[in-house]
Amino acid sequence: MGRNLKLKKESDFEFTKNHKRLLLGSVFLMATSAIGPAFLTQTAVFTSQFFVSFAFAILLSIIIDIGAQINIWRILVVTGLRGQEISNKVVPGLGTVISILIAFGGLAFNIGNIAGAGLGLNAIFGLDVKWGAAITAIFAILIFVSKSGQKIMDVVSMILGIVMILVVAYVMFVSNPPYGDAFVHTFAPEHPMKLVLPIITLVGGTVGGYITFAGAHRILDSGIKGKQYLPFVNQSAIAGILTTGIMRTLLFLAVLGVVVTGVTLSSENPPASVFEHAIGPIGKNIFGIVLFAAAMSSVIGSAYTSATFLKTLHKSLNERSNLIVIVFIVISTMIFLFIGKPISLLIIAGAINGWILPITLGAILIASKKKSIVGDYKHPNWMFIFGIVAVLVTILTGIFSFKEVLQLF
C-alpha cells in the first residue's frame, strides 16, 4: 500500500482515495484506542460530580490534546521516524527504555481491555466473562493472521467507532439533557479550579502513553513520510482528537440527561446504570454493545501500537509486527483467564503510562529544533508552545498517577 501512496512530485500533495481510507483508519485507530472501558467510567463519574460544568473540562482537554497530537504526528511524519527512534536520537537509549515501558504498560492495559470485552459480551448475550474474553482474543488474532491485517484493522476500528457513536447518540437523545445549560457552562463553568483534576485525567486518558502514537505509527507503516504530507497529517491528527471529543461529549450529555433528574449512578458500574435509567432494562444489553466495541478496539490499538515500538528493538523483529501483536494478545488473555485482573499491576502500569507522553513529547519538541533530525523543516513556534503546555499538563498527570502507586505500599 505504501507504494500506492507515493506522490509523483515531492513538492505536491494530492488527496487521493487511498489517503482518505488511511486518514479514516488512523483517525479511528487513535480515537478508539482512547475510548476504552476506563474512558466510559471516567466520563460518567465526572459528569455525575460536576454536572454541566464538566463541559468546560471536555473543551479544554480537547484543545490540549490537539496540542500534543499535532506536534507528535508532524515531527514523526517529517522525519519518517517513530517516537522511540526520535527519542534515541535526542538521548541515546531513551527510546529503547520507552519501548520496553510501553510494552509493559500495553500488556497490562490489554488485560483490562480483554476483561472489558468479556463483560460486554456477558451483558449482551449472558456469556461467561472468561468465554467472552477468549472469543474477543480469537477475533482480534484473526485480524492479524491475515497479510492484510493492517487494512482489516482500519476497517474494524472504523466500524467499532461508528457503532459506539451511534449507540451513545441514541441514548443521549432519549435522556434529553439540558443542551442550552451545557453550552453556556462550556465557556462559563462554576468553580473552574475544581475542574483541574478532571482536565488532567481526560488529557492523560486521551493522548497519554501509547495512545497518541497509534495513528501516527499507522501512517508511517503505510509508507507516508516527508514534509509534503503535512496537510494530510494536520487533518488526521485533529480529526482523531475531535472524534474522541465527539464521543466524550455525546456520553457526557447522555449521563447529564440522567443525573439532572436526581438519579444516583451505580458505584459498581456508573456508565451501565446511565443506559438502564435512560432506556429501561434493555439498557444493560445496549451498554454491553458499547463496552464490547470500546474494549475490542482498545485491544487492537494497544497491541498494534506496542508492536510498533517493540519491532525497532532488533532487525529480526522489524518484519514480524503481526506476530508480535498476536503474542501480545495471547499473553494478556492467558493472564486474565488464569490469574484475573492484577489490580496492582494495572495501577503501576497506569503510573508508567502517565510519564511516557511528557518524556516522549519533550524529546520530540527538542528534536523539532534540531536540524540534524528534522533537516530544513521549520516547526511553527505556536505549535511548539502548544506542545510545552501539553508536556506540563501530562507531567501533572504523571504525578497524580505516581501517588496511586505509593498507596500500594
Each language-model region and where it sits:
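Membrane-interface "cap" regions at the ends of multi-pass membrane proteins
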Residues: 1-40, 195-199, 225-228, 239
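Transmembrane-helix boundary/entry motifs in multi-pass membrane transporters
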Residues: 12-20, 51, 77-107, 123-127, ...
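Transmembrane alpha-helical segments of multi-pass small-molecule transport proteins
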Residues: 27, 96-100, 123-146, 162-169, ...
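Extracellular loop-to-transmembrane helix junctions
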Residues: 45-70, 87-88, 93-94, 197, ...
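Extracellular/periplasmic helix-exit of transmembrane alpha-helices
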Residues: 67-75, 221, 241-272
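Hydrophobic transmembrane alpha-helices that form the core helical bundles
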Residues: 95-126, 133-135, 292-312, 342-348, ...
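Membrane-interface loop-to-helix entry segments
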Residues: 117, 131, 136, 146-175, ...
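Hydrophobic alpha-helical segments and their helix-loop junctions in multi-pass secondary transporters
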Residues: 161-190, 199-217, 363-373, 397-409
